[in-house]
From Swiss-Prot:
Keywords associated with the record: Coiled coil, Cytoplasm, Cytoskeleton, Microtubule, Phosphoprotein, Repeat
Coiled-coil annotated residue ranges, if any: 501-554
Modified residues (Phosphoserine): 406
Subcellular location: Cytoplasm, Cytoskeleton
HEAT repeats: 69-110, 114-151, 163-201, 205-242, 245-282
Tissue spec. comment: Expressed at low levels in roots, hypocotyls, stems, flowers, siliques, cotyledons, and leaves. Particularly present in hydathodes of cotyledons and root hairs.
Assigned GO CC terms: cytoplasm; microtubule
Cited function: Plant-specific microtubule-associated protein (MAP) that regulates the orientation of cortical microtubules and the direction of organ growth.
Name listed for the protein in its UniProt record: TORTIFOLIA1-like protein 1
Protein origin, superkingdom: Eukaryota
Species name: Arabidopsis thaliana
Regions of compositional bias (Polar residues) in chain numbering: 579-590
Length: 821
């Protein structure tokens, strides 16, 4: 017995040690699995920075997230790896890490619920990133999380999960909006709008609590990006989450934004008013007066997109106020007063008036049937053709026509198909000309009033084409409004057929006069053209004579070497018409290009003096003046003037004339083999380099001359080509752009180049082209000064200049707050 007891006691510690060893082995294996999993994730994340392995790494990461076991211990490891990689220097790694955060939450909804606040806070912090792709990834991640978690799902205690989670999203976003960082404020506002739009079952009550905070931000002078926050109000309106108690303050803030100096903010305010009118019309129905007053005050904005949004907002708010319906009764009163005037003059047939009254009564019944038909009727009656009652075109002509005819004219009335009349058969024997002319007039006039008389037909004669086009456009709208098939009932009498021959004779007479005038005009134009060709040939002869004289004088004074300036001035203007009288009226900058010596600057100034001292206005020599004095015909004088202007722009063609080339070669030979004009040589080399696709050499040739006119012409000709330039040439071009920003006539060219500079900097990094810090600050400072003095062109389609300034400064990590001081 004692031995058995001893054996049992000896077995107990052995069993305990075996259990401990099993637990320790399991712990070691799980720890090794965690280490291996973390290593796989970090390896895949590091491969995201390479474009060749990017897609492979994305697939591997998604497989890892899907394949890991559903364990609470796994999620912290994944989140830790993704949080650390979000601060990586490479933009693709940061974008994919943020996307994987939302993908992880979608894959493990229950496990990630406890970590949701930490995940949202981390995503909001990433909004400070200068890369637009990272901020877009943050916006999409917030939208995915909102679609997954913001659902009106009731739990056991009667509360709703979606309503309680709105605070987790809104709190970090509002905190980000409170910071004095423009990109962070804008990104947070965009994320909040995405959160509201993406909610599957929007918790309206929780969303309504956001309105007071949003109104406070709109009224705050410290909140800069109001254009990004205003669409959030529109999103709240779309889901019906506008709090009635906050509506007054929101409208007041929106009205103030309509007068903002930033046109993007003004357009956003107009779009929000449209959204409120469409989705929250019941709330704003009794607050239309102040909004209409604000819209009327700024409806004539100088920016076209803003004007369009303001006009649309004004229309929808007028419809809510009920001011659009008054047009229907006013138009009906105008029609009734017209008929009464015609009845007093004895020119309206009683039967036609009765039928017209039936048509108007039927139309009024149709209008009262539904609100949709009322809105359609308002549009139709508003766009009807103007009444041609005042015969102010040619009163004597219409008086003669009235004396020839009687007061009875054929009248057509449009009736519904159920009121058919057998009188349709009476119109089949009428002539084709009579039927077509009568229907084209009476149909158009019956669509607006129902009945018109002969006098109105004659008043419509002079404006026949314009009225027919307007009426044809309104015919389809009228048919859609009536909804019934209509037919024309025509009552005609035989005694009225005698009224048409005089009218036809008048028409034929007018056609003959028009043909005669056209023939005279063609003869005159042909003679003028021949005279201009002859005059151009004579002027070219005069030019050749003047050039011969100039060449002989330059040969005689060749020892002094100053006669070549005339050739230099002409050659500079020959190459392109854009570098002549039609070029930009800018002053040549006297800036000194880096690397240019004082001798080159003195040569440039001497060349500019030579250009101004030998300017010759061709076409005004002694021969041209004698031709001018001898001519008495005004057309010939006009032709001489136009030919004289064309001579100034025809210098570019004279370069290709064989005689001019021979004269230049002969002049070069007489000068003893001297070199040609350096400006001409550099520009020719630049054009040749552009033709062969060597943009960098083209800019190098032009920049070596130090001539700003040539550089502006080349930049305008090629457009933004920073991605085709080397680092040295790119820095020279950027330096020139910084100088040109202070000239408002070159503002559009500079904006296009700065737009491309921002794009290539975002794509290739802030150190692209190795731009010096001083040059970056100079460009940003000049752009900041140009913002306060120059507005962007109306046809500018890129980013707003202030956005360009902020984006460039953010990309280059340069603080722009000190520019305002």
């Amino acid at each position: 017995m004692r031995s058995q007891t001893a054996s049992k006691t000896s077995m107990k510690p052995s069993s305990n040690s075996s259990a401990f060893s099993v637990r320790s082995s399991v712990a070691v294996s799980s720890h090794s699995a965690m280490v291996e999993l973390k290593q796989r994730i970090l390896t895949s994340l590091s491969r995201l920075g390479d474009r060749d392995t990017y897609q492979i790494a994305v697939d591997d990461l998604e497989k890892i997230v899907v394949s890991v076991p559903d364990s609470p211990e796994i999620l912290p490891v994944l989140l830790h790896c993704l949080f650390d990689s979000s601060s990586d220097l490479k933009a693709p790694v940061k974008r994919e890490s943020i996307r994987l955060l939302s993908f992880l939450c979608l894959s493990y909804t229950d496990l990630s619920f406890s970590q949701l606040a930490k995940i949202i806070s981390h995503i909001v912090k990433r909004l400070k990133d200068a890369d637009n792709g990272v901020r877009d990834a943050c916006r999409d991640a917030i939208g995915s999380l909102s679609a997954q978690f913001l659902k009106e799902k009731e739990v056991e205690n009667g509360n709703y999960v979606g309503s309680s989670l709105v605070g987790l999203f809104a709190k970090p976003l509002f905190e980000a909006m409170a910071e004095q960082n423009k990109s962070l404020q804008s990104g947070a506002a965009i994320c909040m709008g995405k959160m509201i739009d993406s909610a599957t079952e929007p918790p309206v009550a929780a969303f309504q609590k956001l309105c007071p905070r949003i109104s406070k931000l709109l009224n705050s002078p410290n909140y800069i990006t109001k254009a990004s926050l205003l669409p959030v109000v529109g999103s709240l309106s779309q889901v019906g989450a506008i709090a009635p108690q906050s509506l007054e303050s929101l409208l007041h803030s929106i009205h103030e934004c309509l007068g903002c100096t930033n046109w993007v903010t003004r357009k956003a305010a107009a779009d929000v008013l449209i959204s409120l009118a469409v989705h929250s019309s019941s709330l704003v129905a009794d607050k239309t007066d102040s909004t209409l007053t604000a819209l009327e005050a700024c409806r004539f904005d100088k920016i076209k997109p803003v004007r369009e949004s303001l006009s649309e907002a004004l229309n929808v708010w007028k419809n809510i106020a009920g001011k659009g319906e008054s047009g229907t009764m006013d138009d009906q009163k105008d029609v009734s007063s017209e008929q009464c005037i015609l009845e007093r003059n004895g020119e309206t047939d009683s039967v036609s008036c009765e039928e017209a009254g039936l048509v108007m009564q039927g139309s009024c019944d149709g209008l009262s049937s539904s609100s949709d038909s009322i809105s359609k009727a308002v549009l139709i009656l508003r766009k009807k053709a103007p009444r041609l009652t005042g015969k102010d075109l040619n009163p004597e002509f219409f008086q003669k026509l009235e004396k020839r005819g009687s007061g009875d004219m054929p009248v057509e009335v449009i009736l519904p198909s159920r009121q058919k009349n057998s009188s349709n058969s009476n119109t089949e024997d009428e002539s084709d000309a009579n039927t077509s002319v009568l229907r084209s007039r009476s149909n158009g006039l019956c669509r607006t009033a129902g009945v018109h008389t002969k006098q109105r037909h004659f008043g419509d004669f002079a404006r026949e084409k314009w009225v027919d086009e307007r009426m044809n456009g309104g015919e389809s709208r009228l048919r859609a409004f009536d909804g019934d098939h209509t037919e024309v009932i025509q009552a005609d009498t035989s005694e009225n057929r005698g009224n048409w021959p005089p009218l036809q004779r008048q028409l034929l007479h007018l056609e003959r006069q028009q043909t005669h005038i056209m023939n005279m005009l063609q003869d005159f134009m042909g003679g003028s053209h021949d005279g201009m060709i002859s005059l151009e040939n004579r002027v070219r002869g005069l030019e050749r004579i003047v050039e011969e004289m100039s060449r002989e004088m330059s040969i005689q004074s060749g020892a002094r070497g100053k006669a070549t300036a005339s050739w230099r001035s002409d050659v500079d203007g020959w190459d392109s018409p854009n570098y002549g009288p039609s070029s930009r009226n800018t002053q040549t900058s006297t800036r000194k290009i880096r690397g240019t010596g004082p001798s080159e600057q003195s040569g440039n100034s001497r060349r500019a003096w030579d250009k101004s001292s030998v300017a010759i206005r061709l076409g005004e020599g002694p021969s041209a003046r004698s031709v001018w004095q001898a001519s008495k015909d005004e057309a010939t004088l006009e032709a001489i003037r136009v030919a004289g202007e064309d001579c100034g722009t025809s210098r570019n063609r004279r370069v290709s004339i064989p005689e001019a080339e021979a004269m230049m070669d002969e002049d070069d030979d007489n000068r003893g083999g001297q070199q040609g004009d350096p400006i001409w040589t550099c520009w020719s080399n630049s054009v040749h380099a552009l033709r062969v696709g060597d943009t960098d050499s083209a800019f190098a040739e032009v920049l070596s001359t130090g001539d700003d006119h040539l550089l502006v012409k080349l930049m305008d000709k090629t457009g933004p080509v920073l991605d085709q330039l080397s680092s040295d040439m790119g820095n020279e071009a950027i330096h020139s752009i910084a100088q040109f920003l202070l000239d408002h006539t070159l503002y559009d060219i500079c904006l296009s180049w700065i737009q491309q500079l921002l794009e290539v900097s975002v794509e290739n990094g802030a150190d692209f082209m190795g731009i010096p810090l001083e040059l970056k600050k100079e460009l940003l400072l000049n752009l900041h000064e140009a913002l306060s003095t120059t507005d962007p062109p109306e046809d500018w389609e890129g980013l707003a200049p202030d956005h360009l300034l902020v984006e460039l400064a953010s990309n280059w990590n340069i603080e722009i707050q000190h520019f305002d001081t």
